[in-house]
């Protein structure tokens, strides 16, 4: 992941107090804390995720690395959903009907559902 892109987003959000003042109490909800939490988790994932550590070996260490990779993707997805709920629309799911990420699926389903299946 591109850490520089994450930092640019954080810098843009923190560029002035406008975002803070708009979202600290929006419709009685503190959405500023949601934004900050999502930015923090995206940064953690961007700093930690390492697809090069994945291996084709069938051993415990490889299983743990794969599990960590899937958890990182899941945390990233949750953070993106939270930002979507705050900035775009709280009633829709981003990329709901997308099927461009998993191009060689084992099962015919949209990417969101397919990832849930992998994660399970």
Regions found by a protein language model. Give the residues of each.
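Amphipathic alpha-helical interface segments
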Residues: 1-105
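Histidine-centered, metal-coordinating catalytic motifs and their short helical/loop contexts
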Residues: 104-120
């Amino acid at each position: 992941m591109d850490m520089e892109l994450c930092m640019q987003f954080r810098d843009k959000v923190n560029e002035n107090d406008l975002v803070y003042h708009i979202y600290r109490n929006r419709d009685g909800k503190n959405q500023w804390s949601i934004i900050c939490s999502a930015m923090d988790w995206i940064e953690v994932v961007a700093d930690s995720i390492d697809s090069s550590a994945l291996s084709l070996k069938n051993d415990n260490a490889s299983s743990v690395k794969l599990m960590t990779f899937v958890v990182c993707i899941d945390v990233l997805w949750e953070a993106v959903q939270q930002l979507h709920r705050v900035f775009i629309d709280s009633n829709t799911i981003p990329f709901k009907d997308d099927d461009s990420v998993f191009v060689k699926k084992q099962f015919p389903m949209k990417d969101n559902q397919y990832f849930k299946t992998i994660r399970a």
